[in-house]
Design a protein with these regions (language model features):
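Catalytic cores of the polymerase beta-like nucleotidyltransferase superfamily
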Residues: 1-446
Length: 446
């Protein structure tokens, strides 16, 4: 066991955290600030995650804070809720149930420090402050033992290295490489959350490089092993938003054998994200952006304004800027070969700005008339025919959005009601894959 190194430091601990520790002390229990907050304060960074370790059992913790909202999601951890924020209070880890034993069973030395509020002292038995100065991520005592306790720590080592700009200590790195397969025993949800934190770091390419170098990536994302540095650099170039970074990760593999264009790429997005239980909404967002980025590769100046409006409608106006940044990130890595695609992208942006001066009709909901007006003009009863006519009108307005006025649409309906109705009915059926003529409401007897 390491020497109990204590260094006196005065820190401004949040009032609620102080009150938690004081109440535990008042009931005769030991209690210390521990983990990430101590690490961040030692580094001169603002601390955001305030955790407490204590000699009290979970039952004793709940008894001390009986009047406070709390819940337990993890073994021997009670989460206290105060003003919408969560604070974890955990019973000492390890068989001896001492502070030193608890710190020995933490993941890395930089996280294996505690703060004694009574003495204003940092307790550092395993050299965490030394490793902060050396800028290394080192497993506590035996990296293999720490990884066996929780294999998610294999990815956490990479994440801390990337987040903090540290390197992984050699013995710890070797342990990761020798134990990569154990990551398969961790729940997909936990892996997902840790991987997202890697992706939204300042340099996600470094995280992906470490995951590939250690051999972890082949167990986590075998579909995305191909691509090397190029894939990571694409992710680096987009804003640190989970949806955008995930989209960039998939788009960057456009030329790989495992990520083909079109339907196959959609299937890959759905398969990978589904495997890690991402929300359906997030899967749809990423799949839509990846599909649109691939479709954008086919953009040409010969596209008509209507073609471009259909593309905008399919992608969604709200996603256009995201799509453009995604496309720019993907083609920039082509080096000299990027000049042509970047010129096309600039021309695309200019055309889009011009077209967007007239609102795009996204569908029947944007028409200047509704179903009641269709039924009145066409003498129809409520039914699917009304919806088909509205959809047909919205399709017509893709080419001519300036026609989206009540007067013009009524005129179009009246024209459809004329002897040319049959022709229009057939065009509606052709567009929407339906058969048969429009059923008109019976004419009143004169």
């Amino acid at each position: 066991m390491g020497a109990r190194d204590t260094t006196r430091i005065e820190w401004d601990i949040p009032a609620f955290v102080r009150s938690v520790i004081k109440r535990l002390h008042g009931e005769g229990h030991q209690a210390y600030v521990v983990g990430g907050a101590v690490r961040d304060l030692c580094m001169g960074r603002p601390a955001t995650d305030w955790d407490v370790t204590t000699s009290a059992s979970p039952e004793e913790i709940r008894a001390v804070f009986e009047g406070l909202r709390s819940f337990s999601l993890k073994h021997e951890t009670v989460t206290l809720v105060h003003k919408g924020r969560h604070y974890e209070v955990t019973t000492f880890r390890g068989p001896k149930r001492t502070l030193e034993d608890d710190l020995q069973h933490r993941d890395f030395t930089i996280n294996a420090m505690a703060y004694d509020m009574r003495k204003s002292a940092v307790i550092d038995p395993w050299g965490g402050r030394r490793d902060i100065e050396k800028r290394v991520v080192r497993g506590v005592v035996s990296p293999e033992d720490r990884f066996r306790e929780d294999p998610l720590r294999l990815i956490r080592a990479v994440r801390f290295a990337v987040e903090l700009g540290f390197r992984i200590e050699e013995k710890t790195s070797r342990a990761i490489s020798s134990m990569t397969e154990t990551i398969t025993t961790v729940s997909p949800e936990r892996i997902r959350d840790e991987m997202i934190r890697v992706l939204v770091c300042e340099n996600p390419s470094q995280g992906l490089h470490l995951l590939r170098e250690t051999g972890l990536l082949v167990w986590i994302l075998p579909e995305l092993v191909e691509g090397g540095k190029g894939r990571g650099k694409v992710v680096d170039r987009v804003a640190p938003d989970p949806v955008l970074r995930l989209s960039a990760l998939f788009c960057a593999g456009a030329q790989s054998a495992s990520l083909d264009h079109g339907t196959k790429s959609d299937k890959t997005v759905n398969a990978v994200m589904g495997r890690f239980f991402f929300s359906k909404r997030m899967i749809r967002q990423v799949a839509k952006l990846v599909g649109a980025e691939r479709a954008f590769a086919d953009y040409h100046s010969s596209w008509s304004d209507g073609d471009l409006r259909r593309f905008i409608r399919k992608v969604g106006e709200e996603n256009l800027e995201t799509l453009i940044s995604l496309r720019k990130a993907n083609v920039t890595g082509l080096g000299k070969g990027a000049q042509g695609p970047l010129r096309r992208l600039k021309a695309f942006q200019a055309r889009v700005r011009g077209l967007m001066r007239t609102p795009v009709v996204r569908g029947p909901q944007d028409l200047a008339i509704d179903g009641s007006k269709v039924m009145e003009i066409m003498r129809l009863s409520p039914g699917p025919e009304v919806g088909r006519i509205l959809k047909h009108l919205s399709e017509e307005l893709v080419e001519h959005p300036e026609w989206n006025t009540r007067t013009k649409l009524v005129a179009m309906l009246k024209k459809m009601k004329s002897p040319a109705l049959t022709e229009h009915s057939e065009s509606v059926d052709e567009i929407h894959g339906t058969a048969g003529r429009l059923k008109t409401r019976p004419q009143p007897k004169s």
